[in-house]
């Protein structure tokens, strides 16, 4: 079995080594081919390992870093001041081919800027995009992009997002994914010039299985496998859907934990529903891919817990196995060749 090495920014996210270190240890038991390099304050990481009753090994190593890029730091400043930071060092390991992928829960803007600067974009890609899987009512997944890397886009960028998202989804689905553009209506006359132009380009591309427009209330209804939008719209939709899921889960949990007769009834009636709703928990879908780069970079939620970071590491393993950047490059080359002729 070929090993897969992932560089984990141990200082990234709201909780740092308190969750990243236990997550790395758990991930090693989940993925036998995985090796993890923990990048961060060595004393803090070692302390967490001691509390877990474990230590470094051939599969778990530490690379000490002096600095952490804060969540409030502007991307331009992060680029200038990133030397010896845990995030920069994680990306450098991918660039130097000492790691196959990196995972960070740190500053999204800084991660995108550093990844683009260090790893460079694939040929034909103008901007990277954040993509993540979302649950649907059928139990399947849908992939949505962009989720915040680009707050404004032109039609060419949206088209490239569709190509990249289609390539990623196909590696999970093993079939041509259905691609839709998020819009305010399903009719062709609806929407602004941006989405209309993107839809026109997609409808003329045989290599993309374009199924038309999709409205916001259909995102989780399994009518498309890939949903394309700009980063502003995508981020708002993502946060709204996560908040709604958490609301239902917390409300139901509160009712079921009540010690009154109402709580007993709720436990009897809704225990199965509660288990179903737990599949909507955003932590189960943690690990947004930064697509369009010459290397694999996975963005974890800043507030991610241990299980969520394990999922992000799992996404990194999957993308390395499936060689996602080269798949995207091949797909883009085929699409551009088709459009040229």
UniProtKB/Swiss-Prot annotation:
It is found in: Cytoplasm. It catalyses: a fatty acyl-[ACP] + phosphate = an acyl phosphate + holo-[ACP]. The keyword Lipid metabolism applies. Pathway: Lipid metabolism; phospholipid metabolism. Its EC number is 2.3.1.274. GO terms for cellular component: cytoplasm. It holds the Pfam family FA_synthesis. Catalyzes the reversible formation of acyl-phosphate (acyl-PO(4)) from acyl-[acyl-carrier-protein] (acyl-ACP). This enzyme utilizes acyl-ACP as fatty acyl donor, but not acyl-CoA. Belongs to the PlsX family. This is Phosphate acyltransferase. It comes from Vibrio parahaemolyticus serotype O3:K6 (strain RIMD 2210633). The lineage of its organism: Bacteria, Pseudomonadati, Pseudomonadota, Gammaproteobacteria, Vibrionales. The gene is plsX.
């Amino acid at each position: 079995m070929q090993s897969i090495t992932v560089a984990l920014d141990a200082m990234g996210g709201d909780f740092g080594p308190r969750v990243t270190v236990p997550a790395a240890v758990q991930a090693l038991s989940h993925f036998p081919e995985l090796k993890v390099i923990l990048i961060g304050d060595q004393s803090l990481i070692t302390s967490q390992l001691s509390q877990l009753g474990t230590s470094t090994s051939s599969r778990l190593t530490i690379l000490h870093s002096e600095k952490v890029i804060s969540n409030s730091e502007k991307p331009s400043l992060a680029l200038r001041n990133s030397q010896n930071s845990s995030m920069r060092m994680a990306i450098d390991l991918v660039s130097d081919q000492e790691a196959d992928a990196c995972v960070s829960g740190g500053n999204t803007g800084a991660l995108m800027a550093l990844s683009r600067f260090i790893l460079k974009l694939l040929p034909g890609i103008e901007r990277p995009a954040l993509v993540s899987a979302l649950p649907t009512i059928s139990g399947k997944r849908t992939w949505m992009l962009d989720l915040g890397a680009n707050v404004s886009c032109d039609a060419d960028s949206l088209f490239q997002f569709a190509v990249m998202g289609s390539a990623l989804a196909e590696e999970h689905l093993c079939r041509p994914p259905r691609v839709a553009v998020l819009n305010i209506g399903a009719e062709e006359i609806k929407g602004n010039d941006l989405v209309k132009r993107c839809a026109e380009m997609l409808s003329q591309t045989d290599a993309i299985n374009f199924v038309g427009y999709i409205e916001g209330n259909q995102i989780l209804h399994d009518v498309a496998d890939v949903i394309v939008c700009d980063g502003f719209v995508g981020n708002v939709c993502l946060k709204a859907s996560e908040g709604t899921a958490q609301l239902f889960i917390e409300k139901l949990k509160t009712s079921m934990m009540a010690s009154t007769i109402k709580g007993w009834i709720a436990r009897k009636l809704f225990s199965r529903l509660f288990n179903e709703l737990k599949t909507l928990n955003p932590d189960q879908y943690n690990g947004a891919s930064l697509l369009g780069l010459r290397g694999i970079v996975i963005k974890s939620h800043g507030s991610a817990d241990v299980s969520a970071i394990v999922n992000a590491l799992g996404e990194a393993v999957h993308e390395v196995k499936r060689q996602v950047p080269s798949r995207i490059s091949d797909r883009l080359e085929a699409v551009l060749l088709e459009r040229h002729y």
